Amino acid sequence: MVFSSNVFLFLFLPVFLGLYYLSGERYRNLLLLIASYVFYAWWRVDFLLLFAGVTVFNYWIGLRIGAAGVRTRAAQRWLILGVVVDLCVLGYFKYANFGVDSLNEIITSFGMQPFVLTHILLPIGISFYTFESISYIIDVYRGDTPATHNLIDFAAFVAIFPHLIAGPVLRFKDLVDQFNHRTHTVDKFAEGCTRFMQGFVKKVFIADTLAALADHCFALQNPTTGDAWLGALAYTAQLYFDFSGYSDMAIGLGLMMGFRFMENFNQPYISQSITEFWRRWHISLSTWLRDYLYISLGGNRGSTFQTYRNLFLTMLLGGLWHGANFTYIIWGAWHGMWLAIERALGVNAAPRVLNPLKWVITFLLVVIGWVIFRAENLQVAWRMYEAMFSFGTWQLSELNRANLTGLQVGTLVLAYLVLAFFGLRQFYNQPLQTKAPKAAANSDEVAADGPASAQPRAPREAAGDPAAIAYSPSGALVYQPSWLSQLPVLATRLALLLLFAASVLKLSAQSYSPFLYFQF
């Protein structure tokens, strides 16, 4: 089951929320656990046993570490056991096929018989719940969180369905208080609904439309330069709107249940370096890699070479986390290489006048990386790169023109306009003015009894009227009814509601809605 499906929207979610708010507070975590297991079992019931087994094992390891004491030798042995078992489970189900296939390519080239391994099905979400389990037992070992004795709460944390299939990567220490007690308000629920609708529109209205365009460009056997760049740019936008859309939906669903999850994206395509990009893209994963892998490797505590090595290895393994394919390994190495280069060159200390150039270079490096991330294999990636940098004809191939629709082109343009608008708004955003301009500050209408009160005082006749206070360009006070000041907000919400309704209709009508996270 996925969020962008009719069965989730019209059956699972309303039934769950109804039961959730009808139940008492003490039963809500148990209900959340049961609902999350139903959500997961909708895909495969048999893998639910593996899921539950990993959960119970890490709960037990956490208790053993907690009993042994913070950072003791005994606790370290329990931690090593837990991490090794978790990685073995992840390695077997996610990487065994890849490892055997790679080994067979080598040994068959020497005339040897290949190994035979029955195809192993990848349990959905295993990368997320394995990483979250590992972070929990490491935090218990470090003393960052106490070992929980409540199996229901821990199992609900690992399985909580909003984040289960596409993130964010959560940490028990950040949510333990919310599992013990969380507030439920109408405002928080409404905020969650708004956030969910935003993500749904991103995924269904934009990402799904761009998916068909990107898929077609990457499938061309003889792409032109125009075809290749069109496909790369389409996938760049598709991946962001798909992934951030799922994160928005997860955060929104969490708010509906009283949780606040960490933000996962922060306008990554306005980044002026690869270093900044990883502070804005998939934040929950990048911070996990920093806190539990990069620091464990030594971070920047060793020599300069060791620091660069640790950066490179962290991103290499981060690439492998995304999928069992050489394309992901190379993509991770690509980012690791540029992180090391930027650190060596001191890119972040470059003059501000170079910021536009830094943005262009960073965006191109990210787009180039997405090509091999998207490619099914190295051959497809090479074909795309060859077309992109041969600088042949920029005209689209006849086959591509025949399949290209006006909706796809319009959605691609819309996607980049949205990225540009919100990116520039954040880039140039200044804090909202909370004090009167200088011209008004000297007028008789401003109280003079201290800095904190340097706000305009409403006339007597306005007392009791919930009017919004604004300033004209000259600094003169302008009083307007509260409903007028709310018009932009109301218009935005109405537009979002209409887009959400259109996206639901589109979902019902379309037969293609790719799920990008089956490899995670």
UniProtKB/Swiss-Prot annotation:
The active site is at residue 322. It holds the Pfam family MBOAT. GO terms for biological process: alginic acid acetylation; alginic acid biosynthetic process. It comes from the Bacteria. InterPro entries: Ac/AlaTfrase_AlgI/DltB, AlgI, MB_O-acyltransferase, MBOAT_fam. It is found in: Cell inner membrane. Its main location: membrane. Pathway: Glycan biosynthesis; alginate biosynthesis. GO terms for molecular function: acyltransferase activity. The chain crosses the membrane at residues 7-24, 39-61, 78-100, 115-137, 150-172, 239-261, 311-333, 353-375, 402-424, 483-505. Keywords: Acyltransferase, Alginate biosynthesis, Cell inner membrane, Cell membrane, Membrane, Transferase, Transmembrane, Transmembrane helix. The keyword Cytoplasm does not apply. Its EC number is 2.3.1.-. One of its GO terms (cellular component) is plasma membrane. It is an enzyme of class 2 (transferase). It is a multi-pass membrane protein. Belongs to the membrane-bound acyltransferase family. Together with AlgJ and AlgF, forms an inner membrane complex which probably interacts with the alginate polymerization-transport complex and adds acetyl groups at the O-2 and O-3 positions of mannuronate residues. Acetylation of alginate is important for the architecture of biofilms and increases resistance to opsonic killing in the host. This is Probable alginate O-acetylase AlgI.
